[in-house]
């Protein structure tokens, strides 16, 4: 992913000013800075929840705005700071949701294999049948990461999230 000259203003005040960075495939980048520095705005633009005023977000050679949502959801996952889950789900059920863009809700043996791999990778095997609300904060975060790694790309809104895992 490449972000080039990204700019955003609210009511004439620049909150993101010509931000440029690249995230090479397989690498992680943390956006750090004080409150109000524009980190959440940058992530909102990358996730297409906030319109940019100028600049480019290039993902796999295409402007992120030109991706169809269904196609993009297979390649890009967003983890947010607030991760409250309002449904009574087990870890396995939550991770299965990560395959929805691929399976349309009808998981195949290949989907199950990928779900098993994600659970194992995040060391959640012993918790996979527990409900999310029964887990510690770190275990819950690992389950959310397992849900996201199904596409091989994780973008996180909070640089401390991965450090807590």
Model-assigned labels for residue ranges:
Residues 32-34:
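The feature captures the beta-strand-to-loop junction immediately N-terminal to the Walker
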């Amino acid at each position: 992913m490449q972000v080039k000259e990204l700019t955003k203003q609210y009511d004439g005040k620049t909150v993101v000013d010509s931000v440029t960075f690249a995230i090479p495939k397989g690498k992680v980048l943390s956006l750090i800075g004080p409150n109000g520095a524009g980190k959440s705005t940058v992530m909102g633009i990358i996730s297409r929840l906030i319109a940019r005023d100028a600049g480019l977000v290039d993902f796999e050679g295409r402007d992120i705005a030109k991706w169809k949502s269904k196609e993009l959801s297979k390649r890009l996952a967003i983890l947010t700071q607030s991760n409250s889950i309002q449904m009574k789900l087990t870890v396995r059920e939550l991770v299965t949701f990560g395959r929805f863009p691929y399976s349309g809700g009808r998981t195949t043996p290949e989907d199950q294999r990928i779900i098993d791999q994600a659970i194992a990778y995040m060391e959640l095997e012993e918790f996979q049948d527990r409900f999310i609300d029964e887990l510690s904060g770190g275990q819950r975060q690992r389950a959310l990461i397992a849900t996201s790694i199904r596409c091989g790309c994780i973008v996180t809104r909070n640089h401390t999230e991965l450090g807590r895992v």
